[in-house]
Amino acid sequence: FNNKNIEILSGCASLYKLNAHEPYKVIQPRPLKFFPFGPPLIDMATFVRKSVYSRIGLYDDKLVISGDYEFYYRAYCNQVNIAHSDSVLVNIEEGGVSYQNKNLAATETRIVGSKYCTHKTLPYFMYSIRRIRSLISDFMRINYHGDT
């Protein structure tokens, strides 16, 4: 990215169903004010200048799923200049590691949110919402699609 003031650039992603040839939707980065609710940036479509790593450190390797969320939230809290692009920068096939480990992702997102969010109850509230959504999704899949 040519603008030297931009330290992190996040773009859009085309989302594909498994083995599909056409995307079924485009995911856009959300406004940065959404950090307390979950990751607003699309990790695979995000580029970070080397100087940012020198300034705020690397990803937290103790986090299996949410290391990217923690890093970007830390960057945001340290006033790193984060910009969005409307361009699709990557194609993603659904069913990745986060999708396959929703409970761990929800737990780690709560941990990260608790560390950085100024409203300390919000990460726990969002964690509860994610868990309820996951339980409903599992119930619907098992009862209406016959999966076990």
Residue ranges with predicted function:
Residues 1-23:
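Conserved donor NDP-sugar-binding/catalytic core segment of glycosyltransferases
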Residues 9-13, 85, 92:
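Short glycine/serine/threonine-enriched helix-capping/active-site loop
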Residues 15-19, 91, 98:
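Feature marks short, surface-exposed loop/turn motifs that line or immediately flank catalytic pockets
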Residues 16-23, 29-51, 55, 70:
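A recurrent flexible, glycine/aromatic-enriched loop bordering the glycosyltransferase active site
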Residues 32-33, 37-38, 96-105:
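Accessory recognition modules or surfaces
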Residues 40, 46, 52-57, 62-91:
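A short, conserved alpha-helix in the catalytic core of glycosyltransferases
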Residues 88, 92, 99-124:
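Catalytic core of nucleotide-sugar-dependent glycosyltransferases
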Residues 114-148:
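Membrane-proximal basic amphipathic "stem/tether" segments
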